[in-house]
Amino acid sequence: MRKLLLLSALTLLIVSCKSTSATNTKVDNTKERLMRGEWVISSVSYVGSEYIKVQSFGLADSQCFQGSTWKLVANNNKGEMSLTKSDCMSFSSPITWFVNKDGQFVLKVLNAGEKAKKVRDGYVLDVANQTETSFQLIDMINVGGKSTNVVYQFQKN
């Protein structure tokens, strides 16, 4: 009997200590509703540094995202992003996205015709300073052993 109780307590302890993934948490509908619509990234900045060469979302230099357009549809968590800066490669892609209860923006960049469940890689960014006309996405990166934030400033289009 004692062994059974000990085994049950140990099992309960192991199950209760399991961490949750950023992509498996519940959705924050309030933040998502504020994000729906068409947006433009008005600036990309680096907290504590003037300029760092960063490849954002595995696509292009972070400065190429300045002026990019993002269409976010909240009712089905789909959308589209387009890089439009003249001195950078042009790129357009469907995306899936949502905001979890921790206030994190979860993003997957898809290839044309590709389903989100087939894409294994994605990005988790913090949401900050959200209003009806602007918000920030903050990506924490490691540069030379130090954590640095890349801040994408979105403005309603």
Model-derived regions: residue spans:
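Sec-dependent N-terminal signal peptides
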Residues: 4-13
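Positively charged n-region of N-terminal signal peptides that target proteins for export
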Residues: 1-4, 18-19
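Single-stranded nucleic-acid nicking/binding segments centered on His-rich, glycine/basic loops
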Residues: 97
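Lipid interaction determinants
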Residues: 17-93, 101-157
